[in-house]
């Protein structure tokens, strides 16, 4: 079968024909890109691809990289708390207006993580608790060590019927998706949002014991070591300028 013959067959083939996938495989093997596109259009795949491209363009416009570069030996991408909060709040409002799911929920969860200084799985559980109960302030069991920690849902985050779909996604799968989303669009890992709050509070003179209580750290020395390391790195950068 030559290329022109296959084109004629596809033109007259019903959209639901089982043969169409067989012809798609043949066109790919032969390297006939125009026929592959022709079949994709017939199957509606072309529209799906265009939708994904449009979504990517929207996300790139409203989200900006927050990571300033990974600090060697740590998980920290040097995210500024104030800048991150401004970016995520603005992005959430715009996504809320366009109803761009699931990214709207991803940004809401990242914002919850940022303002609570929590782990991504804790932010996911907090978001799900909010969707189910409507409560904005509640206690959750921390991901590590099982400590009980207080969580707050920012006022900007609203309840929406479309968010119920998030309740059906396993926490581990959802956290993996959000981690990929953050790395792609924010150029930072999700844990950097937790570090951003710690740095912000330390710079504002908050007692390490209070910071540990806010962020759910069991060991105070972890907070002290991290803040001292960050201060030392910033001092070296200033000296090098």
Curated annotation (Swiss-Prot):
This is Putative integrase ORF241. It comes from Acidianus two-tailed virus. One of its GO terms (biological process) is viral genome integration into host DNA. It comes from the Viruses. This protein may encode an integrase, which is necessary for integration of the viral DNA into host genome. GO terms for molecular function: DNA binding. The lineage of its organism: Viruses, Viruses incertae sedis, Bicaudaviridae, Bicaudavirus. Keywords: DNA integration, DNA recombination, Viral genome integration, Virus entry into host cell. Belongs to the 'phage' integrase family. The active site is at residues 119, 144, 191, 194, 217, 226. InterPro entries: DNA_brk_join_enz, Integrase-like_cat_sf, Integrase_catalytic. Residues 82-241 form the Tyr recombinase domain.
């Amino acid at each position: 079968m030559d290329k022109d013959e296959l084109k004629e067959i596809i033109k007259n083939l019903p959209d639901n024909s089982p043969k169409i996938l067989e012809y798609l495989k043949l066109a790919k093997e032969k390297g006939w890109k125009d026929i592959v596109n022709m079949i994709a259009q017939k199957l509606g795949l072309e529209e799906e691809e265009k939708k994904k491209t449009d979504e990517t363009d929207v996300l790139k416009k409203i989200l900006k990289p927050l990571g300033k570069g990974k600090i060697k030996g740590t998980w920290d991408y040097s995210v500024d708390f104030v800048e991150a909060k401004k970016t995520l709040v603005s992005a959430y409002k715009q996504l809320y207006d366009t109803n761009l799911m699931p990214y709207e929920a991803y940004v809401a969860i990242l914002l919850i993580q940022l303002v609570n200084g929590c782990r991504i799985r804790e932010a996911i559980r907090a978001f799900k608790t909010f969707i189910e109960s409507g409560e904005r302030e509640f206690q959750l069991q921390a991901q590590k060590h099982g400590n009980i920690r207080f969580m707050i849902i920012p006022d900007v985050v609203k309840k929406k019927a479309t968010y119920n779909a998030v309740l059906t996604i396993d926490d581990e799968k959802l956290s993996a998706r959000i981690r990929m989303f953050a790395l792609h669009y924010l150029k930072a890992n999700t844990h950097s949002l937790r570090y951003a709050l710690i740095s912000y509070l330390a710079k504002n003179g908050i007692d390490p014991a209070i910071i540990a209580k806010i962020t759910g750290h069991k060991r105070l020395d972890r907070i002290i070591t991290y803040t001292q390391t960050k201060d030392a790195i910033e001092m070296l950068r200033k000296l090098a300028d």
